[in-house]
Amino acid sequence: MKLKHIVLGLALTTLLGVIFSNQEVSASSTSSKVVKVGVMTFSDTEKARWDKIEKLVGDKAKIKFTEFTDYTQPNQATANKDVDINAFQHYNFLENWNKENKKNLIPLEKTYLAPIRIYSEKVKSLKKLKKGATIAIPNDATNGSRALYVLQSAGLIKLNVSGKKVATVANITSNKKDINIQELDASQTPRALKDVDVAIINNTYIEQANLKPSDAIFVEKSDKNSKQWINIIAGRKNWKKQKNAKAIQAILDAYHTDEVKKVIKDTSADIPQW
């Protein structure tokens, strides 16, 4: 009788061991598929593309979103391992953030370009712009530089800098139409439309002027000078060694599909970069 109890006890111990072992394997398998993604508070367009990505990854990854309200937060959360990857910024922002915070987050994949545009209430084409016309651009270093590169891309000026180098009006080497560049706070450029011939307005502020991206008379081109403004998915330098690396890769692969490209084109004025 005592022997039976011992045998039964050993059998139960073995059975429980198998159960707990299976549970641990299952939990480990699940955790290796969980990817925490840091984003800014979802806009309808961002939500639409991520909804599609979630469907495409299927059971290869389980995405958990953390929404932030401050642009300083997602990168810090990624560096602190509170999230695995983030999707909210362009190359330029990440590079500057790394320098300022002495971190080494890296771009994992490019996503889209949110081009800035030239608007006008006075002309329907830049070809109609008269000599001596006034153009309003943002006055901060980042957006002002980007605006000048757009003017160069439009054929209105030439600069003696390119790529990542910050451009100022002092870098203008050719201005055949003698355009007058008026530098204003970015938030004031929509109001300036009534007083200037054309204005370069950030996407953030076009609604203030009751404008739509389709109203633009010129759109920033995707070239070597605009590369720094391409949005990206960013993560930690050693992300490929993380236990959820395959799940992260599945998300990157899902983003770069024709299905997501279609969602971006159907729901926004952004330009996919693949």
Regions found by a protein language model. Give the residues of each.
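Short, polar/charged alpha-helical segment
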Residues: 34, 40-64, 73, 77
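Short helix-initiation/N-cap motifs at beta->coil->alpha
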Residues: 65-76, 164-191
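Ligand-binding "clamshell"
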Residues: 96-108, 122-123, 195, 200, ...
